[in-house]
Design a protein with these regions (language model features):
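Rossmann-like dinucleotide-binding domain for NAD(H)/NADP(H)
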Residues: 18, 22, 145, 149, ...
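NAD(P)H-binding Rossmann-fold N-terminus in SDR/SDR-like oxidoreductases
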Residues: 6, 81, 85, 165
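An N-terminal-biased, well-structured beta-alpha scaffold segment characteristic
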Residues: 1-23, 124, 144, 149
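Short, well-ordered coil/turn residues at beta-beta hairpins
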Residues: 2-3, 132-135, 159-160
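Rossmann-like dinucleotide/phosphate-binding beta-alpha-beta segment
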Residues: 63-153
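Short glycine-rich, flexible loops that bind phosphorylated cofactors or substrates
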Residues: 8-9, 136-138, 165-166
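Phosphate-binding beta-alpha-beta segment of Rossmann-like dinucleotide-binding domains, i.e.
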Residues: 18-20, 25-73, 85-88
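Short beta->alpha connector loops at strand-helix junctions that form conserved
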Residues: 3-4, 19-31, 101, 119-120, ...
């Protein structure tokens, strides 16, 4: 057994040769991951980690409130079990939902203040973006330099899916660009 889901870190061919059954337990951690995605968005929005570090260092005189999530636009890439769980949780914040999925569930998303859209629009218009897509050749580096530049400089990106969906070098470069814009 391993922490997480998926086969991308398992040598399935070797396991098969050794007679080891490899399987997944779909949905086993869906609620936990949806909770985590919301917690990460809240922590980023409210500057929880920097404020904690400042307070621990005795630097609690610089107030920062961050931003509210209430009424903001949430982009959800992948509306399977986890993506739907995040959408349900976002309803409590009256968030507008922009969703994208190869297999859209129109009725579900519309019932939760959302609409399906293309990825470019989702990245351009969202205040928070959360990734819940599988890692495939089609999704590899899906979040690339171009998409990162389309994002609002204040937008928050949360990836609880596979790391390879985000081009990490492009993410680092965009982070540096945004830091220069702010300073």
């Amino acid at each position: 057994s391993r922490y997480g889901v998926g086969y991308d870190k398992v040598d399935v061919a070797a396991a098969r040769e050794l007679g080891i059954l490899v399987s997944i337990a779909p949905g086993a951690n869906s609620n936990s991951v949806a909770d985590l995605a919301m917690a990460l968005m809240l922590a980023a929005a409210r500057h929880v980690c920097p404020m904690d570090a400042a307070i621990r260092a005795g630097q609690n005189s610089k107030p920062t409130t961050g931003v509210e999530m209430w009424g903001k636009t949430l982009g959800v890439v992948g509306t399977g079990r986890i993506g739907k769980g995040v959408i349900q949780r976002a309803a409590g914040f009256q968030m507008k939902v922009l969703a994208n999925d190869a297999y859209p569930d129109q009725a579900f998303v519309e019932a939760h203040n959302g609409t399906y859209t293309d990825l470019d629009t989702l990245f351009r218009e969202s205040d928070f973006i959360t990734l819940h897509a599988p890692y495939t050749e089609e999704t590899k580096n899906m979040v690339d330099s171009r998409r990162l530049k389309e994002m609002k400089s204040t937008a928050v990106l949360v990836n609880t899916a596979r790391g390879g969906i985000v081009d990490e070098e492009a993410l680092y470069e965009r982070r540096e660009d945004v830091a220069e814009e702010i300073n």
